[in-house]
Swiss-Prot record:
The active site is at D39 (nucleophile). Coiled coil: none annotated. Keywords: Isomerase, tRNA processing. GO terms for biological process: mRNA pseudouridine synthesis; tRNA pseudouridine synthesis. It comes from the Bacteria. GO terms for molecular function: RNA binding; tRNA pseudouridine(55) synthase activity. Its EC number is 5.4.99.25. The keyword Isomerase applies. This is tRNA pseudouridine synthase B. The lineage of its organism: Bacteria, Bacillati, Bacillota, Bacilli, Lactobacillales.
């Protein structure tokens, strides 16, 4: 059975589930999962775990993300992105300055509250929000706390047809809706807005510049080249690391707790650069949560 992490470049027009389904066929392996959903129209890094590496999938899902995209001021859509229908139109004054936009973007730094868009997979009363939206129903949506580490404009403003668009880059915690961030920024500036393009450039320590498409992976498998499979250690890149000595490693292999002078809730424990376990803080000690020996 093959095992490892794949840095997949998801292309537009497919869901994250579609990507997993196709990889199962390519690799002839059922035990495959992804570490963080991407909307169908969004391209970019989709972390994939295969075989035994699926045991670290939850830590990849929890990791921070980096996105690059484009925000359009002037009109909003039903889906908060370019795929939706026109919802509201507010012509943009060409006197709008980059200074005003940059200042508004700083207001979203740190911990913020978001309300998920109606066209999302968040469940309310056992039903996904997009199911309500498709039925023409709007329901009360639960607020969520997310964290924005960096949010910056990366291009000049382009004024066209009484609209304005510009590129941006954002680094954020899991669960952040970039579509909603684009809409909220527009509201801050006094304009209807939407996210007109998005790609995920980094997730769980994996970078888009080194990601492979499904076609590229299929070609390598055909050639019996499995070098694209990264070690399971890549699945815990976002966890704080601790290097154990031989005695500690033996204790962990038996499932015993360790006394460690650390404060983090979770630790990725290594011995000689090999992942030994994920340790979880319990009172004054650390208990092996998952052992990989």
């Amino acid at each position: 059975m093959i095992s490892g992490i794949i840095n997949l470049k998801k292309e537009a027009g497919m869901t994250s589930h579609d990507a997993v389904f196709k990889l199962r066929k390519i690799l002839k392996e059922k035990k495959i999962g992804h570490g963080g959903t991407l909307d169908p129209d969004v391209i970019g890094v989709l972390p994939i775990a295969v075989g035994k590496a699926t045991r670290v999938l939850e830590y990849m899902t929890e990791a921070g993300k980096v996105y690059e995209g484009q925000i359009t001021l002037g009109f909003s859509t039903t889906t908060e992105d370019a795929s939706g229908e026109l919802l509201q139109w507010t012509p943009v004054d060409e006197t709008l300055s980059v200074e005003l936009i940059d200042q508004a973007m700083t207001c979203f730094m740190g911990q913020i509250t978001q309300v998920p868009p109606m066209y999302s997979a968040v469940k309310v009363n056992g039903k996904k929000l997009y199911e309500y939206a498709r039925a023409g129903q709007e329901v009360e949506r639960p607020q969520r706390q997310v964290r924005i580490y960096d949010f910056k404009r990366t291009s000049d403003l382009v004024f066209e047809d009484e609209c304005c668009h510009f590129d941006f880059r954002v680094s954020c915690s899991k669960g952040t809706y970039i579509r909603t961030l684009a809409v909220d920024l527009g509201q801050k500036l006094g304009y209807a807005s939407h996210m007109s393009f998005l790609k995920r450039t980094a997730s769980a320590g994996l970078d888009l510049s080194q990601a492979l498409t499904l076609a590229e992976i299929a070609e390598k498998v055909e050639e019996k080249d499995f070098s694209f499979l990264l070690p399971i250690e890549y699945g815990v890149l976002d966890l704080p690391r601790i290097d154990l000595n031989p005695k500690q490693t033996k204790e962990v292999s038996f499932g015993r707790r360790l006394k460690l002078l650390r404060q983090e809730e979770l630790l990725a424990a290594f011995f000689e650069n090999q992942l030994v376990a994920v340790l979880e803080k319990r009172d004054t000690s650390y208990k092996p949560k998952k052992v990989f020996l």
